[in-house]
Amino acid sequence: SNMDGVGTFSMAKVMQEHKMMTVITKSTTVDQWKAAAGTGLRMQSVSVCTGTNVMFDPESSDWQTMKKVLEMFPDVKMITVDVANAYHQNMVDFIKKIREAYPNKVIVAGNVVTPEMTEELIINGADVVKIGIGPGSVCTTRTMTGVGVPQFSAIVECSDAANGVGGHIMADGGCTQPGDIAKAFGGGAHMVMIGGMLAGHDE
């Protein structure tokens, strides 16, 4: 998960030994990326992360960081576009912008919980759509806005939609024990993102 305390380089160096990806938090600076290089970190095993602020501010810090990281480390193959609730036109426009700028990168985008929006993001350039609004251990979106769908139901519906348009989904949130990961895969998820299960543990 790209949550603070989990989406770190120290975590990535452990996770890469188990063939797992780590999404580095979008608050990570270019200097921190530089410092991580040469420490045994495999850049193919991490994703750079950005929000959509650049749609409002061309000098957005996470966008500028992402561009610099991808220039310095071409082995970083994955870009994660992370917003709490992806149900707005700016998100779709941003995915188009990213795909045009980086045609050969794997783009992960989210979060959504409905098949229609899953299809929309994939059709407009996302390779993988993150599924989950509310189930995460530190997520407050359902509480604050009332938006959300039970996680297993969302996975089942969205995986079917993604398969229909040649994309993939990543189940994000709600895993508190190993069985939850198995349920997500059983429901059709191609990948599962975990955060809370790793939070507070030594790498």
Residue ranges and their predicted role:
Residues G167-H201:
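Active-site capping/gating regions of soluble enzymes
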Residues S1-H168, G196-H201:
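Active-site entrance/lid segments in N-terminal catalytic domains of soluble metabolic enzymes
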